[in-house]
Amino acid sequence: MRLIIFLIALACPAVAQDAPGPFASFDLASEPVLADPHDLAIGPDGRLYVADKFGSRIAVFDPETLQLIEMLAEGLLPGVHDISFGPNGKVAVAVTGASAVAVYDDLSGLSEAPTSGVSAPRTEGALLHSNGDLYAMASGTGALIRVRDTEFLGAVDGHFGAHDVAEAPDGTIWVADNNARRLVQYSTDLEQLQVLNDPKFGFIGPRYLDVTAFGHLVVADQDAHRILLIDPSVPDGALLGVLGDGSPGLGPGKFDDPEGVAVNGNRYFFSDSDNNRIVRYSVVLN
């Protein structure tokens, strides 16, 4: 028995050494001025736009200081979960409380009636793709919908409760399939290309994600209180790094139900949702 315990003790450091560590360092945090922030995006003007769920609004931050600049459409976007910027300055907003994705010609129209939109029961995610099409995640029915202007182009089912829809550098689309604890990749024509659900990721509730210039996925696993960096180009995907220790908290390397992700070069912005703030992590480049 002593020999067995000794051998296990020898093995433990090797396991810990093989575990992926943090892929970025804590840099800055905003004041807790939000109300359950969800996904966020860098706008065409370089500012940071946050879907502030319980505020039913879009919060605008300076990405350099994480100071709040202004609130847009205050109280007009019930249960808002996502915001996406597309070609020519268009904006799509997943207005979850209205079960619709609203599309505006630009940010100045957020307080007015949308230019167009699509009905999407309990929509959690919206993507204005570089091809000009709108992809909406109708979580209530589990359908990923593709629309061009007002024309319905198709849908795929099987994603009940899914959240984000994000575009990779190669134009493919990634879905954070929350209830199924997986990530699913599609072509622009909604042909399924890949599924990432290997136990090594430890997914509990992947909500929102962004994709780096290298095609790596940065995933907020809300229920695990972690952020994962994943390389999807290898079989079954490779876990490159993790932020957070799996328990809720406040401070560097800690999150409480993180949801939103936005990547900008070597900077990573996250919605630290139950702490009602935005945090920034960075990779120092020599």
Stretch-by-stretch model annotation:
Residues 23-31, 67-73, 110-117, 151-157, ...:
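A short beta-strand motif characteristic of beta-propeller blades
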